[in-house]
Amino acid sequence: MTALYPWLMPIYHQIAQTFDEGLGHHAVLIKADSGLGVESLFNALAQKIMCVAQGDKPCGQCHSCHLMQAHSHPDYHELSPINGKDIGVDQVRDINEMVAQHAQQNGNKVVYVQGAERLTEAAANALLKTLEEPRPNTYFLLQADSSASLLATIYSRCQVWNLSVPNEEIAFEWLKSKSAVENQEILTALAMNLGRPLLALETLQEGFIEQRKNFLRQFWVFYRRRSPLELLPLFDKERYVQQVDWILAFLSDCLKHKLEIDSHRQVADLGRGIEQFSDEQTALGLLQAIKIMQKVRSDLLTINGVNVELMLLDGLTRLVTEVFETQ
């Protein structure tokens, strides 16, 4: 079976038990944040469902297990966004035709829908028709972002599971086994990534804590000098969205400090800077700053063909004119 992270074992066993008891649902929807390794959970569930032994875990010995291990099982299918964009209706129709046929291995059929929130309306409706009339021994495993919205009719046809971030102790111990850093650095990485262990591990491995600290120091210089053109060259072409996220986390923590909210702080290691910046802003000003940078982030992810530097410059200029100079 695909190796599972420790925080995924409980939900795996819960879902697996429903199949062991003959109560496995034909459409299982799992909503989860990125950075939790949920793909391995879906792989493990698919392997279990396809295994002819039908034990708590896939046996790893039957022909079906061997096909799954070789990624060549003819009755296992995947649906995912094309080029990271949408899942189109033609993709769903092709899958519908495949699952309508008899299983080539005379066992179960599984369809893994990765990024179900990316289904176009036509694709969602085409999938709905299949979910409304489930075929024997055919199972759909749907993955969606925790904040995503899907058609209510698709929800109603699925058994829905919500996967939350693991408790800090589990995440901390796992990270400690994977990295040779100080405990406080692990806690900082977890806070930066809202408790998501895989993103925290990447943060530790890539040195993002120090990079973020240096970048936010330059953001402070930009704030003092009101100089967008000084900060603009410091955005990395490979991770400008991540750098926008660092600014958003800083602004969000400033607003929380202003409102005396202590939970879910992402930049707790920069406490003095948070206090000073928030003391110089109004709550409404901080909220407006967050809205501006959220729009920048959204535009960077969704608008093609527009110069990235222009979008960043527009956002930074708006921070100056609509927030900093109005305080």
Swiss-Prot record:
Keyword Nucleotidyltransferase found: yes
GO molecular function, one term: 3'-5' exonuclease activity
Gene behind the chain: holB
E.C. designation(s): 2.7.7.7
Alphabetical UniProt keywords: DNA replication, DNA-directed DNA polymerase, Nucleotidyltransferase, Transferase
InterPro entries, per the entry: DNA_pol3_clamp-load_cplx_C, DNA_pol_HolB, DNA_pol_III_delta_C, DNA_Rep/Repair_Clamp_Loader, P-loop_NTPase
Protein name per the record: DNA polymerase III subunit delta'
Catalytic activity, as annotated: DNA(n) + a 2'-deoxyribonucleoside 5'-triphosphate = DNA(n+1) + diphosphate
Domain of life from the UniProt record: Bacteria
Transmembrane parts of this sequence: none
UniProt organism field: Haemophilus influenzae (strain ATCC 51907 / DSM 11121 / KW20 / Rd)
